[in-house]
């Protein structure tokens, strides 16, 4: 089931940071990983992805560097910073709390 983009929109940065916790990566690879992890139900638009990269880099949450590809075009890699790790931890805690609250509200639990 494909979900509406607005359901995840506020969590785009956390989704990207989660991918970078695993290893440094470049835009296309990050987007393909997100698509694969979601079973094809969620894909970031390229403009959204690169706007998020700029915002995260400007905020000091990620850094970037050019890879040394022997074949093909050079790729810009992104790396999470310690500040980015902290932002991810905060976003994850907020997400977990949101899920708990929404489940309680939707299931009518007190």
Language model feature labels by segment:
Residues 1-8, 91:
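Intrinsically disordered, low-complexity serine/threonine- and proline-rich regulatory segments
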Residues 4-6, 61, 109-110:
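Short, contiguous hydrophobic alpha-helices characteristic of membrane insertion segments
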Residues 6-48:
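N-terminal helix-turn-helix DNA-binding core of bacterial DNA-binding proteins
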Residues 22, 36, 40, 55-58, ...:
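Conserved amphipathic alpha-helical interaction elements at protein-protein interfaces in regulatory
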Residues 50-54:
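Short, hydrophobic-biased segments on the C-terminal half of alpha helices
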Residues 57-74, 79:
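Beta-hairpin "wing" of winged helix-turn-helix
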Residues 80-84:
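Accessory beta->alpha helical hairpin/"wing" motif in late/C-terminal subdomains of nucleic-acid enzymes
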Residues 86-110:
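Amphipathic alpha-helical dimerization/coiled-coil segments
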